[in-house]
Regions:
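Vicinal oxygen chelate
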Residues: 1-39, 48-79, 91-93
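Conserved ATPase active-site switch/coordination loops adjacent to the nucleotide-binding site
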Residues: 82
Length: 93
């Protein structure tokens, strides 16, 4: 998949699926190896519900903090059905 906002020589995102899965440690944001991928979403709770409906799991609570420039950031961590950690985040003024 070509990432938006780039011309022909754009970075790509490759997603693989395997028939045989290797058991690994439980999902944790700070586990060794690949960390997580983050997505900016319009509404964190709605996006989280969609991930859970598709077979994902909760990794932590939904958190909202005010930043030093008076914006708010809301985020949470979930896993996809294969256990990959996903961060869902939303910024507001």
């Amino acid at each position: 998949m070509r990432l938006p906002g780039y011309a022909e020589a754009a970075p790509t995102l490759e997603i693989f699926n395997y028939d045989v899965l290797v058991v690994r440690a439980p999902a944790a944001v700070n586990r060794p190896g690949f960390g997580h991928i983050a997505f900016s979403v319009d509404h964190v709770a709605s996006a989280r519900a969609a991930v859970l409906h598709a077979g994902g799991q909760v990794v932590g609570d939904i958190i909202t903090l005010q930043t030093s420039d008076d914006r708010k950031v809301t985020w949470c961590y979930v896993t996809d059905p294969e256990g990959n950690v996903i961060e869902l985040q939303s910024w507001s003024e």
